[in-house]
């Protein structure tokens, strides 16, 4: 039953965010965190995110502006690795407090507090009307890539920042979508490599 719920949620969220270009992590990661440890939830969300973007790559990948992809995705991939390593570090810290809820033992950890804060911030950004007008000068594209990649690696939340920094890059609508998809895949591959190595070393050895 749990697997059915997880698969259904992943399918529905992927469909809802297909055209927006962002929001999948904000919606899906908290749902996964109900069933898995937070770091595993972030990794599982990354797998769905990558699969979703590979599907979109087949549709719009050829329309991407690869000059912009390089400017955005190179710093994004580097900082995604750093963010993913930081996620692993936080996951290994000692719980700050313990309590019981509905007969189950629960803990308060630095990682949970950080992720909860970031979910709240990104949710507010994505829901606030002013966010629709939020855009940055094209010269800040590498900075946008770095920020998007870092928060993507740490929490899986990256799409809102990616869109805000690419929307004024002078791209046609199709090129914007294609560029966003290719950039997201680069980040996903970078962070999933770190998640895979750190998860294997921590849980399977």
Please provide the spans of the model-predicted regions.
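Structural signature of hydrophobic alpha-helical transmembrane segments
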Residues: 1-3, 32-50, 106-118, 146-156, ...
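Small-residue-rich segments of transmembrane alpha-helices in multi-pass membrane proteins
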Residues: 34-38, 73-84, 141-154, 186-189, ...
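Residue-level signature of the transmembrane alpha-helical core
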Residues: 7, 11, 15, 46, ...
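Structural motif marking the loop-to-transmembrane transition
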Residues: 1-4, 8, 62, 66-70, ...
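Transmembrane helix exit motif
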Residues: 53-59, 83-96, 109-137
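Membrane-interface alpha-helices at helix entry/exit sites of multi-pass transporters
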Residues: 37-44, 66-71, 170-182
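Selective hydrophobic functional segments
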Residues: 43-101, 189-205
């Amino acid at each position: 039953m749990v697997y059915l719920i997880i698969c259904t949620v992943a399918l529905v969220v992927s469909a809802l965010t297909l055209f927006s270009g962002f929001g999948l992590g904000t919606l899906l990661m908290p749902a996964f965190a109900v069933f898995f440890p937070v770091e595993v939830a972030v990794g599982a969300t990354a797998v769905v995110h990558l699969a979703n973007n590979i599907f979109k790559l087949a549709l719009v990948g050829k329309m991407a502006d690869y000059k912009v992809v390089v400017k955005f995705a190179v710093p994004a991939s580097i900082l995604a690795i750093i963010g993913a390593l930081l996620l692993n570090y936080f996951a290994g810290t000692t719980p700050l407090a313990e309590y019981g809820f509905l007969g189950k033992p629960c803990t308060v950890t630095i990682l949970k507090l950080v992720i909860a804060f970031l979910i709240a911030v990104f949710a507010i950004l994505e829901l606030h009307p002013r966010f629709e007008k939020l855009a940055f000068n094209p010269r800040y594209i590498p900075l946008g890539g770095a920020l998007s990649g870092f928060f993507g690696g740490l929490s899986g939340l990256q799409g809102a920042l990616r869109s805000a920094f690419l929307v004024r890059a002078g791209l046609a609508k199709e090129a914007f979508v294609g560029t966003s998809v290719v950039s997201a895949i680069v980040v996903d591959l970078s962070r999933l490599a770190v998640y895979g190595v750190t998860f294997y070393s921590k849980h399977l050895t």
